[in-house]
A protein has these predicted regions:
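A short, polar/proline- and glycine-enriched secondary-structure boundary/capping micro-motif
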Residues: 25-27, 56-61, 132
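A glycine-rich, hydrophobic loop/mini-helix early in the fold
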Residues: 33-64
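The catalytic Nudix box helix
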Residues: 46-47, 62-95
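Nudix hydrolase/Nudix homology domain
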Residues: 13, 58, 70, 99-167
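Residue-level structural signal for beta-strand termini and adjacent loop
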Residues: 19-20, 51, 74, 147
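Short, solvent-exposed loop/turn elements at beta->coil junctions and helix N-caps
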Residues: 21-24, 95-100
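Acidic, metal-coordinating catalytic segment for phosphate/diphosphate chemistry
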Residues: 1-35, 41
Length: 167
């Protein structure tokens, strides 16, 4: 059984409340999800193909990520999820926060810059089926093919706010 902390809309932890994966999140409460875009120091981005058995199966995604466990910070969750799904680590920068009322989720968005060998990506059984590295223009051109673009849009906004649309 996976347990989550409960948060209000402003990402304040609600003490004394524990959420359980698979159970409905009560009105006015949210659970935390961290998503990570991975950029290699050579400028390419990691894409992963979702396992065919998952929701949006066989689609490509530009993020690793998942729900934060009880007691986990957004950054700790991002690091754990990236390591579990890819075997990679690197330097993390928080690039955004997205509240999704329909999912009762708060998405903490991160950019991870890594210098790991690009051939060392380790796929997580049951989660991912393939991976590939693509340049910025290719990433932008694939938006319609991606399972989710939420974190990608946070990345674009982060780049624009820092005067660089290709950070």
């Amino acid at each position: 059984m996976e347990l989550w902390d409960a948060y209000d809309r402003e990402l304040n932890k609600l003490g004394g409340v524990t959420l359980v994966r698979g159970e409905e999140v009560p009105d006015g409460m949210y659970h935390l999800v961290s998503e990570v875009i991975v950029k290699h120091t050579d400028g390419e981005f990691l894409l992963m193909q979702r396992a065919p058995t998952k929701h949006f199966g066989a689609m490509w995604e530009a993020t690793a990520g998942g729900s934060a466990l009880c007691g986990e910070s957004p950054l700790d969750c991002a690091r754990r999820e990236l390591l579990e799904e890819t075997g990679l680590s690197g330097e993390f920068t928080r690039i955004g926060t997205v509240v999704h009322d329909g999912h009762r989720s708060i998405y903490a968005e991160f950019l991870c810059v890594t210098d790991h060998d690009k051939n060392s990506v380790r796929l997580q059984t049951g989660e991912t089926a393939a991976s590939k590295w693509v340049g910025f223009e290719k990433l932008k051109s694939m938006e319609a093919e991606l399972a989710s673009v939420r974190c990608l849009h946070s990345y674009y906004e982060y780049g624009e706010s820092n005067g660089n649309n290709q950070i």
